[in-house]
Amino acid sequence: MGRLLDSIDSPLDLKRLPVDDLPRLCEEIREEIIQTCAKNGGHLGSSLGAVELNVALHYVYSSPTDKLVWDVGHQAYAHKLLTGRRERFRTIRTEGGLAGFPERHESEHDAFGVGHASTAISAALGMLEAKRLSGAPGKVVALVGDGAMTGGVAFEGLNQAGYLGRDLVVVLNDNEMSISPNVGALSEWFSKKFASRTYNRWRRAVKDFLSHVPKGPEAIDMIRHGINATKALVTPGILFEGLGFHYVGPVDGHDVRSLVETLQKLVIFDGPVLLHAITTKGKGYQPAESDKATRGHGLSFFDVATGKPVKKAAAKAYTDLFAEALCEEMERDPRVVAITAAMLEGTGLIKAKQRFPERTYDVGIAEQHAVTFAAGLACEGVRPVVAIYSTFLQRAYDEIIHDVALQRLPVTFALDRGGLVGADGKTHQGAFDVAYLRCVPNLVVMAPSDENELRHMLHTALHHDGPAAFRFPRGAGEGVALEAPQVLPIGKGRLARAVPGKPDVCVVALGTTLHAALAAAEALAKDGVAASVVDARFAKPLDEELIAGEAERARCVVTIEEGCLPGGFGAACLELFERRGLVAEGLRVKRLGLPDEFVTHGDQGRQRAQLGLDADGIARACRAIVGERAKRGAA
């Protein structure tokens, strides 16, 4: 017997299957996801937990006329398999292959591009309103995880949807029980009643009755309070009802037949509806289900039989080095606290949580709150460290400026995943942090070149009387022997490679690009090209004397950064050279970095080579600029 999955090239093919075949299809989808993630890595647990929801939604609704909007997109692998991408699915997260998240350009079934949390409800509501304005057919459904519900924008969307009263369907994929459901016979009874025509008519009748009841008489007030109190006791959805939603659930998110039946009944409702589905992250794969910390979230390559990683980096990852250094600082100074936004494992702060539970805060997917919470702590003498991925700090930009930098509060920002992140692609590249932080007054911006520099920069930030940020990359460190942390002079870089006499070119590197720069300089030396190398350390303030001095000696400069070129570190150097009059005097400058585009997913090493950020690319750029200057001099 062949696989049912092999017969599905579109949602129309899915709809031809009998409902009783759907459980078998779900198991086939699970196996395909497990085998693919074992080779490519990916968000295994979330996708396994949402298989039945994906199948039921596509079985009931008609994409792309009906719009299915995924929050974050971790749970959308089954969606990709059901929408014409089955044959390419094993290319997911690889160079030239499918993206790990929904992307509008990839398929007409990907209604909205996602990767960051809590956006689906707002986007879905916008699509629904656009359909109303244009008269276009189709329904809109947002699938949201319970974790995303900790983000403020999710509740902003719920609030507006309830106010407008449109026919929006929100499916809450609750896989961590963060919204505690009332289980048992009473809950099951209410779920069935909430999805019945009788209950819907009764609800409208009661609502109409209560709207005509005067508020004054004491007896009527007692009736009102009694009804509301009863609802609060018997339904976990009172919050959503209060926002204007019809609440349905909780339902079993792994009973695909029941999900189909429930979704088909939702069409009877007028106005917004929230379906609360209870699921298990990692469902159907024991190693993921038994991983209490992450349930198989964001795995790299692993052995299918055990769920264990296939290989480990030779050197310790920067994330782990940061976490250990932070724990040391927390041990030394009781004022130091750690804050993260739903990323205890991802940022390494789980180590701090285990050692200092009272001084480590996971605020949920609430980056704005995390930053202003840190600002409040700093006001009272605490030294907060906000550990966050570079791409997610973007969400709290106003708070960085208004609540921290403007008041010159000593908040430390530790930006993980600064630079290229590999398989997670466009939505997760740490491309913009240097550009968006260096323009903020009072803020110090640093980037370490190795593990010791990271330790020094954390130590420096915690001893600085003002806000400071440092960014470090995804992946393994250089494997250097660790030193005791030191306070670095603010705005002082170092000459990492000096040359006798006058250099032909000066390479100014930020962060871990230093090592490729040094390798390029060694290769250039064999060709008779003398290259000095500056480890900038600081993107703001720049070490103006060092950088401008070396530039003036060499008359040719190549800057390197693993960040966006517009407004980035190289642009800061160019501004310095312009202020010093070096550009007018004929200084040649070449800036290497990430182009003015969203860099897609792929292998980090290959992408660096393609962008000219490896040793060969840097050497080519140096030869070219030295050659141009020589030609110009000869002319």
Swiss-Prot record:
Pfam families: DXP_synthase_N, Transket_pyr, Transketolase_C. It is an enzyme of class 2 (transferase). SMART domains: Transket_pyr. InterPro entries: Dxylulose-5-P_synthase, THDP-binding, Transketo_C/PFOR_II, Transketolase-like_Pyr-bd, Transketolase_C, Transketolase_CS. The keyword Ubl conjugation does not apply. The keyword Metal-binding applies. Thiamine diphosphate binds at residues 74, 115-117, 147-148, 175, 285, 367. Belongs to the transketolase family. DXPS subfamily. This is 1-deoxy-D-xylulose-5-phosphate synthase. The gene is dxs.
